[in-house]
């Protein structure tokens, strides 16, 4: 159990380091600094150390074993960069909402940082793009707004094309891209 505490804490800190790195590039350093602080709450931390396994998310492991994860629910509802936070009309089956720009940008930083943690030396922006396409974009059960999915796809595609996150530093371009995609709301 002590090893789980140490290793999980190392993963959180390493993840936060990478999120901050990308968030600074993206022009949202305060969000990068405060990113995922709920992971240190008892609800999330205790469950995570109970289900910690090297190389996989402990919350996904708990969900696999028990069918749900209280820590995952807590995490998604306390962190606005998660698409699960942006849901409405639950009595009608749920409706994904458009994430505000700064949270969509933080989600990109989050995915990149998670890729750094889980892919380790195999990480590349092409690998990350492939992961995004397989696990998010082409996953029909994802309850993310289709326009936000499209924005993320375009961003990951550009990073994969140049094998670089430099695009994040072009704040005006990224904002224009987001706005141009989100303004196509009538097409969805």
Regions found by a protein language model. Give the residues of each.
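Metal-dependent phosphohydrolase cores
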Residues: 1-188
